[in-house]
Each structure stands twice: as C-alpha cells, then as structure tokens.
Amino acid sequence: MPLLDSFKVDHTRMNAPAVRVAKTMTTPKGDTITVFDLRFCRPNIDILPVRGIHTMEHLFAGFMRDHLNSESVEIIDISPMGCRTGFYMSLIGAPSEADVVSAWTKSMEDALNKVPDVSKIPELNEYQCGSYKEHSLEEAHQIARDVLAKGIGVNRNEDLALDEKLLNP
C-alpha cells in the first residue's frame, strides 16, 4: 500500500491551530485542486470531543464557504480527520494561507455569534444528518473560543518532513 502524503509529516512537530497545504494537484483540464490540513489541536496531545467536532463540522462547512469561496476558489468538501485533531478542506483553486487563516478566524467568530442555540445548527435533523443526536453546541463553541484565543498559524511541509528512519517498515 502506498504511503499517503498525510503520513509523511512529523505529527510531533505540528503546531495548532494552524493551516497547512497538504497537497496541490492539477486536473487533466488544468484546474488546481488544493487540500488544506486545518489543524485545530496538537496531535497526540489534545483531541476534539466527538459531539463538538460533529457540531463544528455542520457550522464550519457553511461559514468557510461564506468567507473563502470566490470567483477563483470553490470549496469542494470540509471533513473532520479521523484522529479528531482537525479538518481536511479540499477546494478548487489556490488561496493563500493568509486567506484561509482569515476565513477560518471569521468562521470561528460566526460559530460563536451566529449560532446562539441548538435550533440554529444547520441540518440538525434525522433527514440531513446521519447522527443527528450526537451534537454539542457548547463543545463547538469551546472549540471556536480555543482557536480564537490561541490564534491560527501556518505549518509548512518542509518543516514537518518525517525522517525516513521513523517510518514503519
């Protein structure tokens, strides 16, 4: 099985919250697709709570589109990482890291200011959510407060390159 790009970076050296360009590729038609690692907390040190990350998924997906989509950028998907330390965002285009940081910051502010109670969580029903009872707005708000309090930095692949001696044989 091939070694995926996400496992070629040293997770012990990642800062969080931080943006990282995980991958850039060009489609056969010439479109740029960029995948961002949006790391909310430090791997193996902190972890996002299940209900909180689920609620944040519902909020983050819409708010990031509000603040980042443009004539040259269109978000395809924002999905939580299985390790529950952040989200992957795939998009058409190549926004700057600064633009992503700005959109993420505004999205966290929106999560706190535009969603005052559970009734305002988008798609929170059995028809649109596969686990609609597994949410916590309180935890999502705490995630947003933590991100805003710490500030969002940038992780660079060259700074996180994993020493090949550490790879599993």
Curated annotation (Swiss-Prot):
GO terms for molecular function: iron ion binding; S-ribosylhomocysteine lyase activity. NCBIfam families: PRK02260.1-2 (NF002602). Its EC number is 4.4.1.21. This is S-ribosylhomocysteine lyase. It comes from Actinobacillus pleuropneumoniae serotype 5b (strain L20). Belongs to the LuxS family. Involved in the synthesis of autoinducer 2 (AI-2) which is secreted by bacteria and is used to communicate both the cell density and the metabolic potential of the environment. The regulation of gene expression in response to changes in cell density is called quorum sensing. Catalyzes the transformation of S-ribosylhomocysteine (RHC) to homocysteine (HC) and 4,5-dihydroxy-2,3-pentadione (DPD). Its cofactor is Fe cation. The keyword Iron applies.
